[in-house]
Amino acid sequence: MKKSKAKYLTLAGVVLSAGLLLGACGNSTSSSKVYNYVYASDPSSLNYLLENRATTGDVATNLVDGLMENDQYGNYIPSLAEDWTVSKDGLTYTYKLRKDAKWYTADGEEYAPVTAQDFVTGLKYAADKKSEALYLVQDSVAGLDDYINGKTTDFSTVGVKAIDDQTVQYTLAKPEPYWNSKTTATILFPVNADFLNSQGDDFGKVDPANLLYNGPFILKSFTSKSVMEYKK
């Protein structure tokens, strides 16, 4: 995310036909100043780690990036990850993070680098708070089901590790050739521990100041049932 650009994205809370919606989506270009997108209802929360509603995910994925994302054709491409390897047995996925990935505040100020530990923090928080999206990964990540069900209280036994600041590793309970697709789910997105702790229960409330941003946009303002404005 670069603070120098002043591009805005406005979401108008009105109902249009599918044709108009697709037209609006197709007209967004790098040179456009305003992008209108139709949404059915206000997000009740932007806590991307706990919520599993489309109203949350559709907004949050414009603000926060994960390891992988979909391109315009639906292919999985790197986002915060710049490269990854898979072990021969298909159980261990190791991701190298981009060194230029940063967290920014709602004011556009640099807060901290995005690190591998942010992914560990995110999954632990999701497990501790019983995220609505746990079903997506509970049986996938080694040891996660035991942690969620209280068979262990030691999160270090769960198959997500920060090998170093730029390397995060997932160990799976069984091979999943489609694992990379799951990294686009917001439950596997990172979160900065210091910011999360400072926010407490306010983290992810629908207010620009209650999130950190590492994605394409910063939430500039929100008016219920009217406008959500993004700044790039």
Label the predicted regions:
Residues 1-10:
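Bacterial Sec-dependent N-terminal signal peptides
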Residues 166, 172-232:
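Gly/Pro-rich hinge or "lid" segments in bacterial periplasmic/extracellular proteins
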Residues 26-28:
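Bacterial signal peptide processing site
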Residues 38-88, 212:
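N-terminal lobe/hinge region of extracytoplasmic solute-binding protein
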Residues 82-133:
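Aromatic- and charge-enriched surface segment that lines or borders ligand/interaction sites
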